[in-house]
Amino acid sequence: MAGHSKWANIQHRKGAQDAKRGKLFTKLIREITVASRTGGPDPGNNPRLRTAIDKALVANMSKDTIERAIKKGSGAADGDNYEEVRYEGYGPGGIAVLVDCLTDNRNRTVAEVRHAFSKAGGNLGTDGSVAYLFSKTGVVSFSADLGEDRVMEPALDAGADDVVVNEDGSVDVLTAPDQFEAVRDALEAAGLTPESAEVTMRASTSVKLDKEDAEKMIRLLERLEDLDDVQNVYSNADISEDILAELG
């Protein structure tokens, strides 16, 4: 799978840093608010909201805070009017990067994203410059402890497109976006608890990076993730577990 497990590791490291800076909750609340506004306040009928709530619960956000964010998005409370914006660019070694933002000020956001790219040796591209390298994909991820054999049959029976074992032994179940909910629910009903489950942007091909470019790439990803308006960053970078461990 094109860089998914490696990026999951980078995200995990970054997630810990974000939590310390108080940024993670801000981003989760913003996502819950927008998901509620665009798809309604019932997570049973709003897959995006359910995913956002699941992430918030994993991050130990209180149910009261989650409920306030849902009400804010559904119009039961006053709130900022955020819009979704996607930027495309290039990282070190020509790595393709997608940056999804929720912003109340496009001018501020594009300036900050452009600055992050330039400071890390990349550059902001034009619309369509790299988006064609990614496809919207449901990904239900399981730990290495569970193993491929436990996951494979129920996943394929539920309508998954593929089951991929990553370098670290973790298992990713890939689905079409419109099958994501059904597959996730079927796996949970079979007693399999995912580490994460979301509809994401998956690169069709990946680019292996050496240590030097990997270090630059991680710096770019961290600069982008540090921005308040940035919700998700996707790339087609393939960074080996060994290099990630070295860069620690």
UniProtKB/Swiss-Prot annotation:
One of its GO terms (molecular function) is DNA binding. Pfam families: TACO1_YebC_N, Transcrip_reg. Keywords: Cytoplasm, DNA-binding, Transcription, Transcription regulation. One of its GO terms (biological process) is regulation of DNA-templated transcription. GO terms for cellular component: cytosol. Signal peptide: none annotated. It is found in: Cytoplasm. Belongs to the TACO1 family. This is Probable transcriptional regulatory protein MCA1220. It comes from Methylococcus capsulatus (strain ATCC 33009 / NCIMB 11132 / Bath).
